[in-house]
């Protein structure tokens, strides 16, 4: 009898294999509790993080009166200075234009005078601390439209990525393309894990943004930015409504600026492209206030807005006094404030060191 029992047990194990104690013996796996992931290993305990976690816990709880349906969990992130560095010592796209016009042998001798003046203004600001001209955001946008005109989208994407592979000015151990704020990448991951959809809404060129955020998994259709008009290869000056693009044609950039995606333009673009009011918004400057206010005016759902302040002079090229003043301004506006100095355990990750600029630039702060 004992031998018969052992033979039957052996047969069960042989037949069921590794599933013997699950499928064959019907063990209830629902009693096994999943391990909770700590999404914020690069953060210190702080008010802003607690506010974010409390908010997410509330609006994702089906029993809460503040519950938000998953399809309406829309989050908008500014890019420069919000989750990628902008203080080395200026925006990536400004650095790129300076390089394109003043250093790129394939283009610099053919640059129009107004484009050259814009690039030189950036260089004078970076190297000598000279003030940029008033309304330089628009001056730059118009110059950039001209500087990259004629490039196919694939060519421009490759151009941006090639420059992004260069050593980031003012740092050791990091390229421009690696200069993400590591704690903010954890925010992206945390929100996605809780059913939110993250969008990048930047003042920088849409196709620059797409090239930079590709490495962190942001899909191109979730990127909104400055736009120039596109044309197909053989379209010429013919209006798109009158021209049929051929199968062998590519899309190319033109020198016509459509929109600089700052301030209220961000709200207009969000409305046109996403079609929903965000419930969370992240930014770092006055160019993001309209987007934040739009979020906080959400007529249907509880919402929240967060502003980063660049107050860490030890690990980044920051102006603490200016940052603290802005922090007070943002709090008064009803935004949660994230201190890069106090709230981030790291900014760019291990092995990255702030330095004097490798080419002798003084790293002047705005």
Regions found by a protein language model. Name each.
Residues 18-79, 87, 101, 105-107:
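Non-catalytic pre-domain segments flanking phosphatase-related domains
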Residues 10-20:
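Bacterial N-terminal signal peptides
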